[in-house]
Amino acid sequence: PIADLIDDLCGFPFCFTIQSCFGHFLYPDQEDSNNIEPLPSTGTIQSVEYRLAYIALCLEDSRSGQEFLRCLKQLPEIDPKYLQFGCAEWFWERHPNSYIVQVEPETNMLKDKCTVGFQEAIHIEKVRNKFYDRLMTLVSRIDEQ
């Protein structure tokens, strides 16, 4: 679902994508780790394993790169308890000026996955979708310039 976004980012001379993941929800009767289907709106699911959604980018230290960085830093405003911006040390060692934006409950922000209740999973899904929508809008605006 984010392939077009990644393609658009690849067209920017001030940025390259290091890694990304859409974010996946696993639960009984849905154990495909590549699942991209929305969570069911109703059901008897008690707990959900969430595998984080994120995008890691390396940005050029240029005017365009700095402007894009400023916009990325604003993304957590969607929901700061579930959306973080920062620098992942293991990326920075190989790619200075690399940054990550991730959707993960704040209490688990240093983990790749976590188990949450169904209602929290629904909230995470909404935050993830808003994050990618806003990022796509941002990229589209830059693309038009």
Question: Which residues fall in each region the model found?
Answer:
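Structured alpha/beta or helical-core interaction and ligand-binding surfaces enriched in interleaved
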Residues: 1-145
